[in-house]
Amino acid sequence: MASGFFVPGLESKYNTKEIRESMLKSDKAKIDSSFKKLESLEQEKSAWQLINRKISTLNSLAKELTSLNSPFNLMSGNSSNSEVLTLSTRYGSKNETHKLIVDQIASADVFLSSNFDPKKVTIPEGDYIFLVGKKEINVKSNGNIDLLVKDINNKGKGFLSAKIVKSDKNGNSRFVLQSLKEGKENKLVIKGEGLSFAKQIGILSELKTNFNPNLSDIVVNQSSSNNKLAFENNGLVLNPLSEVSIEIPEDIEITSRSKIKFEVKYFDTGLEEPDSKIIFNPGGATFKDAKVESEDSVVDLGSDLKTPLEKKYIQMNMVKICSKEGSLELPLINISNNFEEVEVDVGALSNLEEINIENKANNKVIVISNVEIFDPKNRDGHLPINAKSFAENAKIKFDGVDVERDSNVINDLVPNVTLSLKKPSSDMVEAKIEPDYEGIKRVLLDFIGAYNEVLAEINIVSSNEDQPNNQKSNIVEELTYLSDSQKEEAYKNLGILRSEFLLKNLKSKLESIIFKPYVTSDPNFSIINQMGVFTNSISSSGGLSRYLRLDEKKFDESIRNNIDNVRELFLYDLNGDRVYDNGIAKMLGDCLSPLVASGGVIYNKIKNYDLKIFNQKNKVEDYKKKYEDRERKVEGELNTLDFTVKRMKDQENTLKAFDFNQRNK
């Protein structure tokens, strides 16, 4: 602030600069003092904000440990071969291990056409019907193959997709139909004009793969005195030592996958089946010489009311397949005394001509029904020619039990665990559901680190250290993890809140929570140092720093081998009401939440600083204004003095000149 006042030759003589500074000294001191107070308030607020952030972080970690999503409540799913099987866990999963073999993964129907030139093929017009399981997709074609693909994709969203893929440089393409649903119940069936189109471009074969032989005709044509057959209740009865022959029609295509399935049962000769009917005679009635006789009453009890038979089985080689090259007797079949469905592979011989079913027992009667020869890969009797994959269920052995599912994502085998099948393998895969040891360790390390940072900030702002000649602080220097900027801020905050009893009481409370014993299932495991967390009570400065330290080996072993007690040490439900009542994390959260919550103690302190800083800024501005006013007044007075001195000097010179002239007269 320049005075603008200078008297040549008199500045030093009258000390006008010193006079000016002396006159403004008290006003300048008020500005400096109020500004320092403002800086101090802003630094104190910054210190409280830093403490608030550190405490909030520690409180959040305490809340995380006691929440439903606590790593103590979550399990980790680990597979011994993630290329075959992976697993993910949800809340509520248990610590368990299972052994699985993935025999087959679930797949969907993907059918390709033969090569064709889209420009030369004629697309049938009309209704194209596609079934994916029970979902029907109806598309009307106008003869344009590109529009057909577009309509299939629009109407088949989530169920069916179609595309045309260029297959060579000669302009040929292949039509691809892909079911978007896995599982054998979601077979892709093509009907309507779509069936004609599929046959035309080589998606489906012209030949059929399935047929149902007429059992009554077989009985009529093949029964004899030496081959006693009968047709009763839609079933073909093979008496002892009888057989039937099922000829394969010429229009039926038999493949290596072809099977015969039928329902079969047996009963011993001379024994009738238990009757499901009750027959009784209600008698007659006579009235005035008129007599009425009643007919027998028949009550059909139905199958549910039949006298149940004890289920028994016999074994028999009863299926033989024949071709021009010879015949082959198929393996034993288990036959029950109640109807059960059996399937037998019949595709072992090429050019199959007939299938024989024989009753080789001389004291058993065999009954068969619902006979069908089929290819399991057929679609409504037609065989896909260029199938990339077929709709199949996933098949696994789960702890030795055969299991089928229609998806590779299985949620219902292990509670709250999802198994994801990747590929089949004959190797056994071990699926472990176990505590998330790494997740627990990570959060506990974060918790310990956050606790130490809270303690460090309290130690810094509460410090009573003297720093003569800018001597370094032991409290700050022992915090080796601080960056240069953080260390600079720490020195600014050193001792700034040393009069705050709240922080001293908080430190004492935190240490009490951390180091006191807690109730766990193991009376020999109740304090934190038993899991490898301890404190070196004396800091490098000779004070009580009480920072937490780790015995890493003991810490890791406790988490890995004693996880239940570690959990109880941090969060414990005393009465089984699923609400945590005790433990380090629980008690720490209860202590810290009221401090940092909106309206809490520290929150309000920071808010109060906003008002103090606002008022102090006004005070600084007020002192500056008063200083400027005072400065202008002083400058005015000194300028007046300057003018007076100049006039006096001029008068002095005038008088000297007058005196000189008088003497020279």
UniProtKB/Swiss-Prot annotation:
The keyword Transport does not apply. InterPro entries: FliD, FliD_C, FliD_N. GO terms for cellular component: bacterial-type flagellum filament cap; bacterial-type flagellum hook; periplasmic flagellum. It is found in: Periplasmic flagellum; Periplasm. Changing residue 227 to D: In strain: 212. Changing residue 264 to I: In strain: 212. Its main location: periplasm. Pfam families: FliD_C, FliD_N. The keyword Cytoplasm does not apply. Homopentamer. Belongs to the FliD family. Required for the morphogenesis and for the elongation of the flagellar filament by facilitating polymerization of the flagellin monomers at the tip of growing filament. Forms a capping structure, which prevents flagellin subunits (transported through the central channel of the flagellum) from leaking out without polymerization at the distal end. This is Flagellar hook-associated protein 2.
